[in-house]
């Protein structure tokens, strides 16, 4: 009798196990509800070549508080544009990729070692990292003296190169202006001569008309 009374329980267990197995593996393929398309990520650096990149920590001088404030830790780069040849300094925070510094390195800019620390250096720049041009005083710190020297050397090379370009352009513009003035002077010298020749021709024509108008004897 005991064996008979246990049969329904066994059957119920078998049905539950079978149902559970069917729930676990139905063989159905579920398609995703939303399909995510690949989005091309642009950084604005696609048309530029990196000529130097170093890990560092950047600070800016807060004029109101008269103290240095950290801008972020990441990689500082010198980027050269393939078309214009202009070189800018860009630094992004390593974790968020937020821009800490973004400015051109131009003629007249200078960089110098920070007082009392040969791993740091400072410079002034018209920075655009916040979406508008601001006069900033930056200080950057590197892990080694060698990296700091490499940064300063490249900074100076770029600034000097831009200064030479400006001097060359000024010289070219001056030469072009002088050439234009010379041409104008030559043209002004020609005008009196041309005018005299025209007067002679006019006089000759008038004389001929006069001779033709005189009746013959």
UniProtKB/Swiss-Prot annotation:
Modified residues (N-acetylalanine): 2
Stored Pfam families: Ran_BP1 (PF00638)
InterPro entries the record matches: PH-like_dom_sf, Ran_bind_dom, RanBP1-like, RanBP1_RanBD
GO cellular component: cytosol; nuclear pore; peroxisome
Annotated region (Disordered), positions in chain: 1-32, 160-217
Basic and acidic residues compositional bias, start-end: 181-217
Localisation: Nucleus, Nuclear pore complex
SMART domains: RanBD
Lineage: superkingdom: Eukaryota
GO biological process per UniProt: mRNA transport; nucleocytoplasmic transport; protein transport
Compositional bias ranges of the Acidic residues kind: 14-26
Record domain RanBD1: where: 29-164
Keyword list, A-Z: Acetylation, mRNA transport, Nuclear pore complex, Nucleus, Protein transport, Translocation, Transport
Quaternary structure annotation from Swiss-Prot or TrEMBL: Interacts with the GTP-bound form of RAN1, RAN2 and RAN3.
Protein name as catalogued: Ran-binding protein 1 homolog b
Organism, as annotated: Arabidopsis thaliana (Mouse-ear cress)
UniProt lineage: Eukaryota, Viridiplantae, Streptophyta, Embryophyta, Tracheophyta
């Amino acid at each position: 009798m005991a064996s008979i009374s246990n049969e329904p329980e066994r059957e119920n267990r078998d049905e539950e196990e079978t149902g559970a197995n069917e729930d676990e593996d139905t063989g159905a393929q579920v398609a995703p509800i939303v399909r995510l398309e690949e989005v091309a990520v642009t950084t604005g650096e696609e048309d530029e070549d990196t000529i130097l990149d170093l890990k560092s920590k950047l600070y800016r001088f807060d004029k109101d508080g008269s103290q240095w404030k950290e801008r972020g830790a990441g990689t500082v780069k010198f980027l050269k544009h393939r078309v214009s040849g202009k070189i800018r300094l860009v630094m992004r925070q390593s974790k968020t990729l937020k821009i800490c510094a973004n400015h051109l390195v131009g003629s007249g800019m200078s960089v110098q070692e920070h007082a009392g620390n040969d791993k740091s250096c400072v410079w002034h720049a018209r920075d655009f990292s916040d979406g508008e041009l601001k006069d900033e005083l930056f200080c950057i710190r590197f892990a080694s003296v060698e990296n700091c020297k490499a940064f300063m050397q490249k900074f100076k090379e770029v600034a000097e190169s831009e200064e030479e370009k400006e001097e060359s352009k000024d010289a070219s513009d001056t030469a072009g202006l002088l050439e234009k003035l010379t041409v104008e002077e030559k043209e002004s010298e020609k005008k009196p001569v041309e005018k005299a020749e025209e007067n002679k021709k006019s006089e000759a024509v008038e004389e001929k008309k006069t001779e033709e108008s005189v009746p013959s004897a």
